[in-house]
Amino acid sequence: MVKSMNTRKAQTALHTLGIMTCPAAGEVPVPEKFYFRKLTLIGKELGLAVFVFFPNRIDWQRRRVVGYAYSAESGRWEKRVFPFPDVVYDRCFYSNRNAYAAYREPIRRLMSTSGIHFLGYGLKGKWNVHQMLMRDERLRPFLPETEQLQEMNDIARWLDGKGELFLKPQGGSHGKGVLRIQKIPDGFGVTGRTARNEPVRGGFRSSSRMLDWVRQFTNGRPYLIQRYLHLNTASGDAFDIRALMQKNSKGLWELTGLAVRQGAPGSVTSNLHGGGHAEEAKPYLGRLYGDAAGGILESVKTLAQRVPEVLEQHHGRLVELGVDIGVDTDGSVWLLEANSKPGRSAFAALPGKQASLSAVRNPMLYAKYVLDTRKGVPARQSASL
């Protein structure tokens, strides 16, 4: 039985915040339960009633959604029917192209519905983000050479000219589906992770066999070819730096924290979901780069703080960004990616808890700011699904 949102309880909150997400498997189809529970409790402190809803469970005529609210009393997620929320926090992750296609139209419709304010509009894909960042002359020198994979011969061309490359899906996350391909004395070597985030490694004597294998591996999904950067320690462990940029209680961007993510031994990626771990950025860089670490850290911060301004200028309103930055073996800094729906696991693993606490609290503080002022954020420009 689905309960309706209790009117008397709802009136104790000044506003409602709906966390929009794609349903997970299980009896209670709420993903990111731990994170969403924290948001609910913080929302209660701030006078916000928080619930989770799904874009495929919307009653447009009655302006209602079916979703779940966390009950601190019972410690459970309770299924209810809610009025349309005042603000929407988008945490939808699409498992594949079919899921994206299924949710695209209802989300577009919700974006254009009067009385609903999206805290931010999700970025489309890695190629789209790369193109927007390339338009900024200050960021352009820090972006690795990148192009869309149109045909398998593109890979052969890159290998002929550069000897190695990095192949990554346009819509992927968690380091899934990535490959490093390189020329080796007796053919070609391939290292990476499958779409299920399992390690993969192989060798091919001929270009044709390697390309046939890559064709099956990519399986028709959109991919990017990128210059391979040697972002690893002296012992060969891959690492990068996650900078979390968020809007705060005043509607301004701030750098919430920096965390180094080091991949599992032998991994081509630094992602934690592939068995890596997180460390504090300053001491980690100090061990690797000595006296140069201070300058590298300042470059990382400068890049991270520039990215939100550029993306909002070309894309539209954003609420937070995970900016991934690499440092190669000679200390050069590279802007790798920007993600509008960042995770927080790297900061939760650090010894200091301030960044981890702020990472969770800031979206709610910004939501309260938006609801209290209804101004102070740029109007939506070209953001689209």
What are these regions (language model features)?
Residues 13-27:
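Nucleotide-activated donor-dependent transferases that construct or modify glycoconjugates
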Residues 19, 89-90, 167, 226:
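Redox-cofactor binding/interface segments in oxidoreductases and associated redox assembly factors
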Residues 31-38, 45-146, 150-154:
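Conserved N-proximal alpha/beta basic substrate-recognition cap immediately N-terminal to
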Residues 208-240, 244-326, 360-373, 379-381:
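A long amphipathic alpha-helix within ATP-dependent nucleotide-binding catalytic cores
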Residues 261-269, 339-352:
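Glycine-rich phosphate/pyrophosphate-binding beta-alpha loops
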Residues 325-327, 332-342:
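A short beta-strand motif that forms the metal-chelation/ATP-contact edge
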